[in-house]
Amino acid sequence: MMVLTWEASDKNLLSNAVSLYYASRPEGPWEVIVHGYKNTGVYRWDLPTGLAGPVYLRLEAADKAGNVGRYELPTPVALETGKQRVKVIGVGPAK
């Protein structure tokens, strides 16, 4: 399991605004971790069986107008046994 944490704020976020993704390369392809999740700031990810090597992580947060803010970690996260904690440091406004 890996614990993912983040902060996403917008006065018009959807109730299930957050989607999390992972990829083995920075350009993807991106696989869904969870889609349409509540903006609780924490998700406990049960890693898929056979997932190996470091992964890149992406967070998307959507508002009621359909705008989507996206943040991708610039460096991959190592997958190791034991406790893992990842903190996403921000999502900016959609452009």
Language model: regions and residue ranges:
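Low-complexity, Ser/Thr/Pro-rich intrinsically disordered linker/stalk segments at domain junctions
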Residues: 1-95
